[in-house]
Structures are given as C-alpha cells and as structure tokens.
C-alpha cells in the first residue's frame, strides 16, 4: 500500500465525517447501547489513549469508565464533531496521525475501534511496536473491529487484496485500506510479535480483542 492510498484514506474520513454516524451505524441509538455494553465489558480504566476516535461515539463511553482519555484522529472534521459530542472534563482531543504522534506519557489502556483493519499490512508490525512503546508496564490494548466474514460487503480493487473502493453519499470515490480481522490469524501473528492476545466475536459482524505484551517474546 502506497503513502498515496493512506493519504486518500484520511481524506475519505475527512469528507465522510458529517455522514459517518448514519452510514456506519444506521440506528445510532442502538449503536450507542451496543458500544456502552462493550466498553463496560472491556473495563478500560486509568489513562486511556483512543486511536482514530472518529466522531466520538466510543469516546463518549470510554469517558464513563476511564480516569483520563486522550483521543486522537487524523481527520479534523471528525474531531470537531467528537469535541462537540463529548464535553467530559476527563477527555482531551488531538488532531494527529498515530504514526507520527508523540505522547508525553504512557497509557494504561490503548483502545481503537474499526481502526486495525485500516492499518496496511506493511505497517502492521511497526504499529504494534508503537503500541508497545506507548503502554505502561502493565498496560493492555483493547480493540473492536469487523470480522473477516464481513469482507463480501466491500469492493476490492483488481489485484489489490487490501485496498477497497468506498463512495460517499455524493458519489465521490476513494481508495481505503481494509484488512478484515480473522481472530485465529490475528492471535497467531501477534503471538509471533510477542503479544498475548485473545480475540472473540461480538455478534455476527464484530470482533473484540485484548492484547498484552508477553512476559517473554516468542521466538
């Protein structure tokens, strides 16, 4: 995946921000209830970093359980919506690309929803090393994403097994990275990188995962 595609992906989410909730979730009230349930089950606490916070639906739930939430996203239009939605005193937002962002602290929990599947395969290992560097000593990574069974709903570009074409409501087309999550495969890959990871399903469409750095990297 080229840098051009990654830049186009950010541009897509900038342009989609105003219509994101409706097109991603449909019934936003039902989505909020599901999100609240999942976050309560995952129990994020302490200092939480949310990567790719989008319009703030997950941030809203994280704020209820975390001591402090730092929420970042590369799309300023999405962050503006999130700031308006979530005005909790324990939440701060930043417009930032996670791959170039530098934190002034380490985090007890790093959380992301519908983000891992947008990480290019060529950046997968670097991304998880970045997470390791951002975690406190006993920290954990929590994530939600789409199960590989949902792959059929996307239109993959010819010869590009991780690049799909997405359209906005106005018809504009964008290239976006999309690597759906196969739970067993993800557990295996992270194990090879020195993570203890458990990935399960939540309904037919989503996966939920928890990962911690293993005490000894596997060889």
Regions found by a protein language model. Name each.
Residues 111:
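A conserved beta-strand element that flanks and buttresses the S-adenosyl-L-methionine
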Residues 144-190:
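C-terminal alpha-helical "lid/dimerization" subdomain adjacent to the S-adenosyl-L-methionine
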Residues 55-100:
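Class I SAM-dependent methyltransferase SAM/SAH-binding core
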Residues 125-137:
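A short glycine-rich, Lys/Arg-flanked "PGG" loop and its adjoining helix->strand segment in the class I
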Residues 180-212:
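Conserved Class I S-adenosyl-L-methionine
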Residues 1-43, 46-54:
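Conserved class I S-adenosyl-L-methionine
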Residues 114-115:
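Short catalytic micro-motifs in class I SAM-dependent methyltransferases
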């Amino acid at each position: 995946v080229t840098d051009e595609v990654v830049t186009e992906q950010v541009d897509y989410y900038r342009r989609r921000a105003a219509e994101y909730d409706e097109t991603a979730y449909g019934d936003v009230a039902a989505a909020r209830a599901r999100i609240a349930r999942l976050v309560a089950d995952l129990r994020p606490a302490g200092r939480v970093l949310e990567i790719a916070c989008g319009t703030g639906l997950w941030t809203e739930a994280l704020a209820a359980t975390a001591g402090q939430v730092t929420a970042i996203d590369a799309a300023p239009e999405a962050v503006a919506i999130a700031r308006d939605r979530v005005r909790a005193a324990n939440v701060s937002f930043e417009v930032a690309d996670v791959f170039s962002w530098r934190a002034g602290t380490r985090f007890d929990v790093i959380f992301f929803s519908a983000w891992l599947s947008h990480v290019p395969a060529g950046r997968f290992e670097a991304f998880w090393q970045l997470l390791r560097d951002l975690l406190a000593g006993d920290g954990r990574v929590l994530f939600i994403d789409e199960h590989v069974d949902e792959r059929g709903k996307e239109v993959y570009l010819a010869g590009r097994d991780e690049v799909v074409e997405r359209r906005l409501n106005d018809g504009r087309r964008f290239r976006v990275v999309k690597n759906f999550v196969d739970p067993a495969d993800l557990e295996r890959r992270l194990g090879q990188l020195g993570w203890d990871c458990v990935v399960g399903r939540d309904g037919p469409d989503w996966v939920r995962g928890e990962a911690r750095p293993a005490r000894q990297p596997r060889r």
